[in-house]
């Protein structure tokens, strides 16, 4: 329990080594893929931590001035950028085209991602009725914009997902930051 207490606090790129952030994102992404496709090929974690996959900042780390100024809580911008909730895995080729744009600018790139956790930021894939894919993405949230309220909602969603991935009991008032 001592280790769990030490881990509390925001999960940010400043507090946690990059390879650990990548691993956490990979496990979350892998879980969704396995639930959706039921394919053992998705069991290999190296698929998600390969050199062809990058950590994408949804709220850009180096934004254009117009992107930064459009954020609803400008004074909190820097604190949100490195948080786990603001990160997602994205194929390197797609990430190169969306780099420092607004969420609206990045949406078309996210839709092209093969990772359901990333794709679902803007579009929740559906196939038929009550299919394995639909059940896998049911609790994922899509967003029309990326502001402080969206960040809070995704934080709650990722916390629920993390509890499933690591078979953790739900503790009242605890969320992934």
Segments predicted by a language model, with ranges:
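Long, cytosolic, alpha-helical-rich C-terminal regions that act as interaction/scaffolding modules
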Residues: 80-83, 87-177
């Amino acid at each position: 329990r001592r280790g769990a207490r030490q881990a509390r606090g925001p999960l940010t790129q400043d507090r946690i080594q990059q390879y650990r952030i990548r691993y956490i994102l990979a496990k979350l992404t892998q879980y969704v893929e396995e639930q959706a496709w039921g394919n053992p090929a998705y069991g290999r974690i190296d698929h998600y931590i390969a050199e062809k996959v990058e950590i994408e900042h949804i709220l850009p780390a180096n934004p254009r001035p117009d992107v930064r100024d459009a954020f609803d809580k400008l004074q909190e911008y820097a604190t949100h950028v490195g948080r786990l909730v603001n990160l997602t895995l994205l194929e390197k080729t797609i990430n190169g085209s969306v780099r420092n744009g607004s969420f609206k600018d990045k949406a078309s790139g996210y839709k092209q991602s093969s990772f359901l956790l990333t794709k679902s930021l803007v579009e929740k894939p559906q196939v038929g009725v009550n299919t394995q894919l639909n059940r896998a993405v049911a609790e994922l949230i899509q967003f029309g914009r990326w502001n402080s309220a969206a960040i809070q909602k995704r934080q709650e969603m990722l916390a629920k997902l993390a509890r499933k991935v690591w078979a953790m009991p739900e503790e009242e008032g605890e969320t992934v930051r």
